[in-house]
Amino acid sequence: MSKKKARWRKLDNAAKLYSAASNKKDTRVFRFYCELKEEVNPDVLQEALNQTIETFPTFLMVLRKGLFWHYLEPCNLRPIVKEEYKEPCSRLYIKDKKTLLFEVTYYKKRINFEVFHVLTDGTGATEFLKELVKNYLYLIHKVNGLEPVSLLPEDMTVQDQEVDSFLKYYSKDQKRPEKRKLHAFQIRRKKKDGNHLHVHESVVSVQAVLKRSRELGVSMTVFLTALFMMAINEEMSKMQKKKPVVLMVPVNLRKFFPSLSMLNFFNWIEPGYNFTTQDQSFEAILKYTKEFFETELTKEKMSAHISELLALELHPILRLAPLELKNLCIQAGAKYSEKNTTAIFSNMSAVKMHASYVPYIERFGVYTNTPKFELCLCSFQDKLSFAFTSRYDTVNIERNFYRLLKEQGIASEKVKPEFPKTDEPSEQEMKVYKIYSFLCIAIVAAMLVTEYNFHPRIRWTLFTAGGVVTMWISSSIGFFKRYNLLKNAMWQLFIGTIICFIWDALTGWHSWSVDLVLPIMSVSTLTAMFVIAKVRKCPVREYLIYEIMAAGYGLILPGILLLCKVVKNPTVSMFGALICFLFLVAVILFKGREFKEEMQKNLHV
């Protein structure tokens, strides 16, 4: 494979949705794992991971925010193999914190690969894990004569991995007829204690499922989709059956459009069945599901859906909306669209390894963190691994599903869950912050009550209350932006000057906030950023945009105030603006290429 360093890149269509909609509970992280027949050696696994990253440099990315969109940027971070230490599919992307978007852990005989959906999809994750497992097994067993093999095309390049296939196959002339979506039945159960992810796995024979599917004249996915809808239906009341059971079924678009991309490239279909108005027999449900798949799984339908998704993203007016506004709209849209589906059924298909490596592998498995009830499956050799995940007590649906499989002559074997005792995320920091906030509120309230009852001649109560509010705002910014000191400094500059403007106005406007505070804070912040970047040895791409913002703020705002004659004593303002101006000139002259790249990344639409 041809190797070349990855560069910064725009997010693909699906990644833009995931970056906006992910949160602490809905992490948009999924796990692909490999169960070996021997205990994992962590040192060898680390060496194998280092080799795998050389093959897939596109994974060494961090998520950054621009003015209009997020983007992915190469970083000098390297993944470190750890023993499994937290709940599966926990959050990988933490706002403002520079972290990789994937993680490799191990537990006993299992190698886990967890990844944020912004980085890749199921196909990309499969290829990464296969390469990792291959490298690991070779390093362990080469002394026994195991030969090195290649799992990827020899002429595959990094550019192939980075292709945005959504854009490649987008055609603005393709349009899909609009369908009115009905609200689907929603699975609602009491949440588990602590809102932890609930994972139940079982294994069945691939040949048994294929044999029965062929007897019925349908594909494996159609067969299992019909059973899944029936399993859900059995838990619905008569009133609930007025709404259809609708499944979201992801579709790998590489089966329709040639692509070697490691980015997201998938679509979905939504088979739904109303068990009140339609025949409830298995034969009728299977027939409907088969016809639905045959109708929807065509190249024309997939192409039209791609065009529909991209048309919204590429709308000239919507593209110019600020990122934060886009995020709010995407989050609202994602919340609303949840009403259109009951559950998710994701078939990752068969994982294939070179024959010489097969004897060392027990099976592969996959599951994901989702706000919905989800069934994921993948196969290896004759083992088909099922994984039900949710944050609700919904074991009845799983029980129904496996019973229906048994009625079709397919036995299942429950997998005993093997997870270490995880480190619960510490809430101590947030508790301290809440106590601090309560004390600040108490002091402000006490000052206001004192002011109302005693009317002191020198209004020290109001000054004290204002000072406490100012201190709380400043420290809150520091707390929530603690992962990024440079962004923290920029926020402190922006909020700090605004607070000073307000104080100046409330005390009779003596102009000290614009004459002194604004230029001094701007230059001080710029200096602090420079020192932080040097001390921490930050790459240019990590600090330059913040220094440009601080210098621009210290130049443009005082300039406007000088022109409007708001500044009474212009000396300090002019010197501050001069320093900021010279800094920007120096950046353009000595860091021109980096300056241009930062502008492209942060202003791309």
Where is each model-derived feature located?
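Hydrophobic alpha-helical membrane segments
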Residues: 521-531, 542-563
